[in-house]
A protein has these predicted regions:
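Positively charged, low-complexity intrinsically disordered leader regions
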Residues: 1-37, 332
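Substrate-binding N-lobe of the ribokinase-like
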Residues: 2-11, 41, 45-113, 331
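A short, aliphatic-rich alpha-helical micro-motif
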Residues: 15, 151-152, 198-199
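Structural motif
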Residues: 21-23, 126, 155-158, 187, ...
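Conserved phosphate-binding/catalytic loop of the ribokinase/pfkB sugar-kinase fold
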Residues: 103-109, 116-151
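Short acidic, glycine-rich surface-loop motifs adjacent to enzyme active sites
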Residues: 153-166
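Conserved phosphate/ATP/ADP-binding segment of small-molecule kinases
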Residues: 164-266
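Conserved post-catalytic alpha-helical subdomain immediately downstream of the catalytic base
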Residues: 246-247, 272-331
């Protein structure tokens, strides 16, 4: 066990030298913090007295934030509006040291904003402001042109599909083609409603619901032990055939993760979370750390172990959070 932990620590040390690119739907996460002291006389809802507001990059931009915690060479590609929210998002990214030359800012696009109202450490309500707009032919050409220029200078590509319209099958095909051509790690967090095929990716990381949805199977209740969950195993078998990915990592919430790789038996990794305050962004952390691990020379099992521990840390934080190398090392030390 000690030898394996030493290897994991060494892998974390290599993350800083990796060059990573995050691709996907961009959002601005707004958190409105306040106190609740009474119920509204107008409707049976709490009245929140606002004390502060904070903003974070969300969606694929949060994947980039997680990557940036470990490596200074992090870039992002996606679509944002040339509106106030878009300008705020780009400013936050640049302040964090994330390269934004791949962010397409368009006058006709509206930046997606997700507003969460928090009181007493609980989410009271979430308000989404979004308008899905498919990429134009010109925007697709610009995105592909950026990818063509950027891919040779990165070690890994991380795709986060939130189903908001930036990722289309032609763009997915180009990402897969370039990753194969240049021998780059390609890790994908898919969305159940887009039905995009990521054939030949290094790793795909759906959650349980996404795994069933992607192959057209009805969701089934979890089974213990996880490795005997026949419905999940069948969904995974079909996914591996559909996507031809080298590894499939299914995240299962409180059940942890299930890793499929090659001809080996599925590997179940138990969850490590001590307390769960907020699961938003846990998938972003998992795919970012898994991709970093693979880019640093980890085996799929080692990369999954790091991703699993990192996810257990981030769900213990409130808001769109990230994990630092120090936190990950500390968590590994007590496992």
């Amino acid at each position: 066990m000690r030898a394996e932990q030493n290897i994991l620590h060494q892998l974390i040390g290599r993350f800083a030298g990796k060059r990573m690119l995050a691709v996907g739907d961009l959002m601005l996460d707004e958190f409105v913090w306040g106190r609740v002291s009474r119920i509204s006389p107008e409707a049976p809802v709490p009245v929140v007295n606002v004390t502060s507001e904070t903003y974070y990059p969300g969606g694929a931009a949060n994947v980039a934030r997680n990557l940036r915690e470990f490596t200074p060479d992090t870039a992002l590609m996606g679509l944002a509006g040339a509106d106030r929210a878009g300008r705020r998002l780009v400013e936050l990214l640049e302040t964090a040291g994330i390269r934004t030359e791949g962010v397409l800012q368009e006058d006709g696009a509206s930046t997606i904003v997700k507003t969460r109202v928090i009181a007493r450490h609980q989410q009271v309500v979430r308000v989404d402001r979004e308008r899905k707009v498919a990429l134009t032919t010109e925007q697709l050409a610009r995105a592909c042109g950026y990818l063509e220029r950027a891919v040779e200078g990165v070690d890994g590509i991380v795709v986060a599909d939130y189903g908001k319209g930036f990722l289309t099958q032609p763009l997915a095909d180009e990402i897969c083609r370039l990753a194969r051509k240049h021998g780059k790690i390609l890790a994908v967090d898919p969305h159940p409603h887009t039905s995009l095929v990521w054939r030949g990716a290094t790793a795909i990381k759906p959650n349980r619901i996404e795994a069933f949805s992607a192959v057209g199977l009805p969701p089934a209740d979890p089974v213990e032990p996880v490795c005997r969950d026949e419905a999940l195993l069948e969904a995974a078998r079909r996914l591996r055939h559909l996507w031809e990915a080298e590894s499939l990592l299914v995240t299962l919430g409180e059940q942890g993760m299930l890793l499929f790789h090659g001809e080996a038996e599925p590997l179940h990794l138990s969850a490590h979370a001590q307390e769960v305050f907020d699961v938003s962004g846990a998938g972003d952390t998992a795919i970012a750390v898994f991709a970093l691990g693979m880019s640093a020379g980890a085996t799929p099992r080692q990369a999954a172990e790091l991703a699993n521990v990192a996810s257990g840390i981030v769900v213990g934080k409130l808001g769109t959070a990230t994990v630092t190398p120090t936190e990950l090392r500390a968590a590994l030390a007590v496992i």
